[in-house]
Design a protein with these regions (language model features):
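Short HxH-centered metal-ligating active-site micro-motif
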Residues: 1-2
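Histidine/acidic-residue-rich, glycine-tolerant segments that coordinate divalent metal ions
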Residues: 5-9, 13-139, 148
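A conserved active-site cap/scaffold subdomain adjacent to cofactor or substrate pockets
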Residues: 135-165, 170, 175-176
Length: 176
């Protein structure tokens, strides 16, 4: 959707320039991993925008508007916990739940939100709950966090705090 919408804007801009006899060069770059791995960062690093006077992008949203500015710096990081499986009814005391660690981490991060800058955002998704059997203490679980703030040093600070919360969750559940 993003690539198609941006390509349509390139075609419209080309037509506008031709109609108004405007000189210039238009370059269209697809930017893979728009949010997850930051495809644009590699293009910037490799000099694709060095002689560029203007860079435009398009992103779907509600309504129509033009905006300017910058987006937030972000880290996306997986946290994987490993525990000890056990039968949850017969011998739960032998288990160490990786899923409990993920849930405690999520609670800790949610409480941290009150104590971070207003412009920061932290989102998460449980990507592996350990299985679909509720009668088993889950030995592996994983959560993906997206940590965002206006500046990279702010993201790094939040990332370190999130890592400490993960360590605390592992300590509480005797998982790794």
């Amino acid at each position: 959707l993003i690539g198609t919408g941006t390509l349509a804007s390139v075609i419209a801009l080309k037509d506008f320039m031709k109609e108004h006899n405007l000189k210039g060069t238009i370059r269209y770059y697809g930017c893979p991993a728009e949010e997850n791995a930051g495809g644009k960062a590699f293009l910037v690093r490799d000099g694709y925008f060095n002689d560029c006077d203007l860079a435009l992008c398009w992103h779907p949203e509600q309504g129509r508007r033009a905006c300017y500015g910058s987006t937030k710096a972000n880290f996306r990081v997986f946290f994987t916990f490993h525990g000890t499986p056990a039968h949850a009814s017969m011998c739960p005391e032998l288990g160490r739940s990786a899923l409990d660690a993920v849930e405690l981490m999520d609670v800790g991060v949610n409480y941290m939100r009150e104590h971070m800058i207003d412009e920061a955002r932290i989102h998460y998704a449980i990507t592996d709950a350990g299985g679909d059997a509720p009668n088993v203490v889950q030995s592996r679980a994983q959560v993906l966090y997206a940590i965002r703030a206006p500046k990279i040093p702010q993201v790094k600070e939040l990332y370190n705090r999130v890592c400490n919360i993960a360590k605390g969750a592992a300590l509480m559940t005797e998982t790794t």
